[in-house]
Curated annotation (Swiss-Prot):
Belongs to the HCP family. Catalyzes the reduction of hydroxylamine to form NH(3) and H(2)O. It comes from Clostridium botulinum (strain Kyoto / Type A2). The gene is hcp. It catalyses: A + NH4(+) + H2O = hydroxylamine + AH2 + H(+). The modification Cysteine persulfide is found at residue 425. This is Hydroxylamine reductase.
């Protein structure tokens, strides 16, 4: 069976990638990632039961989060690292199984189905009835890449034959991948929430359950949105408690004459470590793409060698990384297949990886040693200037709520007629120029609320302000879509409205990968309706599942700029 992947917006032909991923991943990488998900589901079978028995599941919890994150679009292309993850997962699954058997395999639960009997079956004492109750994901075993490869042939997306069940299972899985990304960042800062892990494991197990109906899976998808809100709130708390609340900031987009390191991705802990270790070395630090919002946090402003932001959204990195001249640190997705001209200057860390690119590991005490990349930078010339000037951002919920009197007054007087939430992702497709044209064509009495790399389609346009309020308010990274939800809920309260959809807010969101999926599900959980997704609807939505979203939540797509603005403003 050839590869099949349709988890991102650029799925080939709007259906799925079957030969090679548009993202650049090969068939082998795609299938190994499928196998990682299968292993994670097997672990979840045991960890969810171990949790109910009061056993320690921290190792499994961490592994599940990291593994889901590692399979997100443009995160990891390193076959060796991915195969090692499969191997490690099987060991963790076995240790959980052993712990449950040792504990007696019995616990108080209405769903208790004689775990002692099940594990006797696992150990070779077969009972036909019990044998059927254990899913293959919990029992299959292998110990080398060749056997992994054979197994991967059988466990991909298309292993679920029913189109609608497959669609719901994948929608749920992609929501979990986005959730895992946010939970990983919170965990790195010392913040966690057991209920989120418990839900993730419950949901993973549910994707293996052939007895669940489409309605039951739909309910789980919507429940996923609830935990999406929880995980974004947790990450917001982690970021702001550690680094302070983002504040209005003018960010330099030019360069200096010192050698520099370019840091891309989302992990603020990595940002902090890099700034600390480069201080006093003569090496400057620049953010790239989704790391831009690091410029808004008070804790990072004390570093005089933190220059600003270099470049644009992730998909332009081939030309921008080449021009930067210094080393690049990828803390998370999005990685584009590197050109030979800079591949030896590229470093990955965390769950990211690319074959032939140096990887910086985390030590046992949770620290990272960036000395190699710092010494590398010292041997490089300073970055080539590709633009200059400033952009403004830092409008997360705390900052916007501080401006609430101005904003409310502007709405009441009619100076602001409507807000447009244009959060989400950027991408390569030319059809995404729609978002630049849309921003330019919006009436002058409207304000754009944004988060994520979608902002790069319009954050350098001169769209002016309304009574001193910039017409583009950037809350931060994609997870800071949480801020936009907090702002909307506060405005609902201020204007004494019963329904969030009564606010003068329209949602025109550009999506690309799985973090956008969890943001969408979170918004649906909060009751937001009539969200428009573009530039295309997800390939993983079957016609029937798409119909559910349209009929129950008013999900729509985009058409032309003029038609859409007319529709939104009426």
């Amino acid at each position: 069976m050839s590869m099949f992947c349709y988890q991102c917006q650029e799925a080939a032909g709007g259906r799925g990638c079957t030969v090679k991923g548009v993202c650049g991943k090969t068939e082998d990488i795609a299938k190994t990632q499928d196998l990682i998900i299968y292993v994670v589901k097997g672990i979840a079978i045991y960890s969810s039961q171990a949790r109910e028995m009061g056993l320690n599941t921290s190792e499994a919890d961490k592994f599940i989060v990291e593994s889901l994150f590692s399979t997100i679009t443009n995160a990891n292309f390193d076959a060796k690292a991915l195969n090692a993850r499969v191997q490690k997962g099987l060991k963790i699954r076995q240790s959980l199984k052993d712990a449950i058997i040792k504990a007696g395999g019995s616990y108080n639960s209405k769903e208790n189905k004689s775990w002692t009997s099940k594990f006797l079956s696992v150990l070779g004492i077969k009972n036909d009835k019990d044998e059927k109750e254990i899913h293959d994901a919990a029992v299959w075993a292998a110990n080398n890449p060749e056997d992994f490869k054979k197994k991967a042939e059988t466990v991909g997306v298309l292993a679920t034959e029913n189109e609608d069940i497959r669609s719901l299972r994948e929608l749920l899985t992609y929501g979990l991948k986005g959730m895992a990304a946010y939970l990983e960042h919170a965990n790195n800062l010392g913040y966690d929430e057991d209920s989120i892990h418990a839900f993730m494991e419950k949901a993973l197990v549910a994707t293996l359950d052939d007895t669940l109906s489409a309605d039951e899976l739909t309910a789980l998808v919507l429940e996923c949105g609830k935990y999406g809100v929880d995980v974004m709130a947790l990450l917001d708390k982690a970021n702001t408690s550690t680094y302070g609340n983002p504040e209005i900031t003018k960010v330099n987009i030019g360069v200096r004459n010192n050698p520099g390191i370019l840091i891309s991705g989302h992990d603020l802990k990595d940002m902090e470590e890099l700034l600390k270790q480069t201080e006093g070395t003569g090496v400057d630090v620049y953010t790239h793409s989704e790391m831009l919002p690091a410029n808004y946090y008070p804790a990072f402003k004390k570093y005089k060698h933190f220059v600003g932001n270099y470049g644009n959204a992730w998909w332009k990195q081939n030309e921008e990384f080449e021009a930067f001249n210094g080393p690049i640190l990828m803390t998370t997705n999005c990685i584009v297949t590197p050109k030979a001209s800079y591949k030896d200057r590229m470093y990955t860390t965390g769950v990211t990886g690319f074959e032939g690119v140096k990887h910086i590991n985390t030590s046992k005490d949770g620290k990272k040693d960036f000395s190699e990349i710092i010494e590398h930078a010292k041997r490089c010339t300073s970055p080539k200037e590709i633009e200059k000037g400033e952009i403004i951002g830092g409008f997360a919920h705390n900052q916007v709520l501080a401006l609430a009197p101005q904003v409310v007054d502007a709405v009441k007087t009619g100076a602001i007629k409507r807000f447009f939430v244009m959060a989400g992702c950027d991408g390569r497709m030319k059809s995404r120029n729609y978002y630049t044209d849309f921003a330019k064509a919006l009436p002058k009495d409207t304000v754009i609320l944004t988060a994520g790399c979608a902002k790069y389609k319009y954050n350098k346009l001169d769209l002016g302000d309304i009574n001193g309020i910039p017409r583009v308010l950037d809350a931060g990274q994609c997870n800071d879509s949480y801020s936009l939800a907090v702002i909307a809920l506060k405005l609902k309260e201020v204007f004494e409205l019963e329904d969030i959809n009564e606010l003068p807010i329209s949602y025109n969101i550009a999506w690309y990968e799985q973090k956008a999926v969890i943001v969408l599900l979170a918004l649906l959980h909060l009751g937001v309706k009539n969200i428009h997704l573009g530039p295309t609807l997800p390939a993983f939505l079957s016609p029937n599942v798409a119909k559910i979203l349209v009929e129950n939540f008013g999900i729509g797509t985009i058409s032309s700029v003029d038609e859409d603005i007319k529709m939104f403003m009426n």
